[in-house]
Amino acid sequence: MEPGLQQAGSCGAPSPDPAMQVQPGSVASPWRSTRPWRSTSRSYFYLSTTALVCLVVAVAIILVLVVQKKDSTPNTTEKAPLKGGNCSEDLFCTLKSTPSKKSWAYLQVSKHLNNTKLSWNEDGTIHGLIYQDGNLIVQFPGLYFIVCQLQFLVQCSNHSVDLTLQLLINSKIKKQTLVTVCESGVQSKNIYQNLSQFLLHYLQVNSTISVRVDNFQYVDTNTFPLDNVLSVFLYSSSD
């Protein structure tokens, strides 16, 4: 072919548009475009699975701790000869479960009160103490915990009434509680009042423990007879 024709042929051939030129491998395939989404979904799956496993493990640990706590709780279902109403039963159970049972007592108030110094039923529970004429007499020296609870029933008239509860050691007041009821002067059928007092005191041998009230006629021995109690136990022995 002549040189002129070759030049014309080469000039007549359309040259490719630069905009239409695509580098090899630069065309994204549909499979290649979904790879980032798959990677993200896998990350979320692994994260949620790990969180679920941690939650299951935490619940299992909590259940194990609860079961161990229940197993370590002492069984206090032993039947007691005396049954109270509000807290006297719990107090009696606490006394029975004390580590030191060398000296303790649990007494209920007598229904036949005729003195400000209260008397107690002699058929109560007494260990290491002697009961005589309203007194508990100490037989072992040491630190004693004393608690008394009384229920009062007052029929108000036109004057106020003072209710007292006094804990005495060797006939001397060591702790007392005073409550005034019927202050308004308005007549009412019944007013129930609970008084309680406790004392932690070191006692020698032959020391006496007693309880005194000013108005013994208001001590309610009928409605809640089992809630009028005196409890004593040796907290710490000196021997």
Swiss-Prot record:
Pfam families: TNF (PF00229). One of its GO terms (biological process) is immune response. Residues 1-43 are cytoplasmic. The chain crosses the membrane at residues 44-67. Residues 1-36 are annotated as: Disordered. The keyword Glycoprotein applies. Cytokine that binds to TNFRSF8/CD30. Induces proliferation of T-cells. Belongs to the tumor necrosis factor family. This is Tumor necrosis factor ligand superfamily member 8. It comes from Mus musculus. The lineage of its organism: Eukaryota, Metazoa, Chordata, Craniata, Vertebrata.
